[in-house]
């Protein structure tokens, strides 16, 4: 995968394995630190690597853990243009040069109303808009076989909806320190927690 991204010129954010779980036993953090060292050593010579995300995604971890993960990345790749990032609301965010957030919409919706002009911002994932995590009652979740009109609603939601939401137009209008974002998701796919597929992608297996 990384070789293909190098060849095609696709940027990659390399994430540490782990999600929504923390264990206070000391060996848990030590194993995460080992994972970070190994993944940086594995991928540091790939041209496609744009950013490292060494913290555990959506996890309530100690503040000193965040600082240590940033230090580990810098130790394993002690060269210019080595960037690490985390969520703008995460513990230890002050240790990272890149923060993940949404455009602020003048403080009317998601985003960081206290954006720091010295920090680079990126929207790690945007687009999905649901009333619950199981249904498809959403302008962003549309199956291709539902027809043209639902697909146009989905396209408008992603491009420039009439309501306040992160979209292509909103990302285009951000100041230059906000360097873009990644749509969630690129393609329809099966979900492990529900029998119906996720229909929020720009593509499915047939297009």
Show which residues each predicted segment covers.
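Substrate-binding/catalytic cleft of secreted carbohydrate-active enzymes
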Residues: 1-207
């Amino acid at each position: 995968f990384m070789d293909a991204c190098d060849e095609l010129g696709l940027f990659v954010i390399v994430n540490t394995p782990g999600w929504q779980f923390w264990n206070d036993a000391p060996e848990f953090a030590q194993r995460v630190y080992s994972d970070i060292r190994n993944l940086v050593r594995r991928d540091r010579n790939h041209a496609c690597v744009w950013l490292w995300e060494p913290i555990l995604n959506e996890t309530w971890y100690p503040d000193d853990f965040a600082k240590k993960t940033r230090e580990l990345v810098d130790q394993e790749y002690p060269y210019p243009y080595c960037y690490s990032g985390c969520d703008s609301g995460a513990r230890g965010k002050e240790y990272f040069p890149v923060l993940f957030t949404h455009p602020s919409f003048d403080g009317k919706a998601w985003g960081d109303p206290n954006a720091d002009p010295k920090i680079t911002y990126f929207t790690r994932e945007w687009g999905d808009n649901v009333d619950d995590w199981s249904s498809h009652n959403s302008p962003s979740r549309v199956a291709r076989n539902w027809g043209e009109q639902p697909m146009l609603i989905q396209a408008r939601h992603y491009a420039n909806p009439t309501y306040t939401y992160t979209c292509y137009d909103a990302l285009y209008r951000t100041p230059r320190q906000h360097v873009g974002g990644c749509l969630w998701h690129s393609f329809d796919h099966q979900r492990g927690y529900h029998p119906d597929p996720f229909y929020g992608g720009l593509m499915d297996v047939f297009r």
